[in-house]
Amino acid sequence: MGRLVKQKGFDILLEAFRLCSDRHPQWSLYILGEGDERETLEAMAETLKLQERVKFLGLVKDPSLVLRDTDMFVMSSRFEGFPLALIEAMACGLPVISTDCPTGPSEIIRNGVDGILVPAEDAHALSAAMECLLADPEKRRRLATEAVNIVDRFGAEKVMMLWDQLRMQVVGIPQRLDVDKESIVLPGHRS
């Protein structure tokens, strides 16, 4: 799920899927999103003889409907900022696997607790993690149960509280922001 661009590493995901696909013919891979790499990725899936098992769904109005019908979420990015797709998947109660790329995933996933981190750009490690997770229903259930707690850690109310704490530390303004109002007014600024 994401923009189909080099940064997101969908080529790595396709290679990882190829590595384990022969042993698991019942598996399918769904890729959501659009981007400059779509044709290249579709050609790669065909070259890898995966075109029947890899589905490019394009932009999906409500990705949670697709996510709820899957067994896991895999993020194969080369680099990230703060990957909302990962948080969305966890909030849907999916066990997640992600590359431990610079910034992002390791700030979100507690490795082995609510998700699995593997080295970035390592299709073999990604494939092994996928096989491990699908072979162990209890581990999938445990990770999924913990994953939904992401809302407690990164929900809007929690994030606003953290921003408020940061603002107080940096600016030294003692008043708290009122997150229950429709708009936020900072002291000294009137709307």
Predicted feature residues:
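C-terminal alpha-helical cap of glycosyltransferases
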Residues: A156-R190
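Conserved acidic donor-binding segment of nucleotide-sugar-dependent glycosyltransferases
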Residues: R110-G112, I116-A123, C132-P137
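A short alpha->beta transition loop at the rim of the catalytic pocket in nucleotide-sugar-dependent
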Residues: S64, D71, G93
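A short, well-ordered alpha-helix in the C-terminal region of glycosyltransferases
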Residues: E46, A125, C132, K139-R153, ...
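Short acidic/histidine- and often glycine-rich active-site loop of Leloir-type glycosyltransferases
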Residues: E88, C101-G112, I116-L117
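A conserved mid-protein helix/loop that constitutes part of the nucleotide-sugar donor-binding site
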Residues: R3-L19, L29, D36-E42, H124
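Short hydrophobic beta-strand element within catalytic cores of glycosyltransferases
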Residues: P95-T99
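Aromatic "clamp/platform" in nucleotide-sugar-dependent glycosyltransferases that forms part
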Residues: L59, R78
